[in-house]
Amino acid sequence: ILPYHRIVKDIKGMEPKAFIGSMKFNFELMAMPGFPCKPVEKHCFGLYVDGEWFHLKAYPDIYAGKDSVGQLDVSILQDKVLGPVLGISDPRTDERIRFMGGNHRLKDLAAAADETGGAAFAMYPTSMEELMTIADEGKLMPPKSTWFEPKLRSGLFIHKLSD
């Protein structure tokens, strides 16, 4: 399972510094000058905006006590940034957001954000354990939560229920 990165076409008319500053309420923020920021653990994100990379780490209190879906990185990003800050309430239908599979380089992600003056979010991949837990609970994954390589011809995953 690979990550499914997000590219936002614009930052809703905000100045880049104000947009970056809005992250401080929910994330530890560290500038990564000159380095693409690939998240290396759960609840961490790479943010690219205005030619700069930043490392974001979600504060534990924003996901503690949430159900399995609410603890996913894609849910945290949607609930704390895409929805309230950028006004993207439905990523499936909003034309301001697009997605890039984890098989692309972070350089490609940054270039896509630069094309429109928007922002890009490098995601940490959803784990197989998270995927199976949500499936076992009968819940649905948020849109564009995972990118699988190689692609399965059938498009199906089979999860053994018992031995």
What are these model-derived regions, one by one?
Residues I1-D163:
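Surface-exposed, charge/polar-rich loops and edge strands
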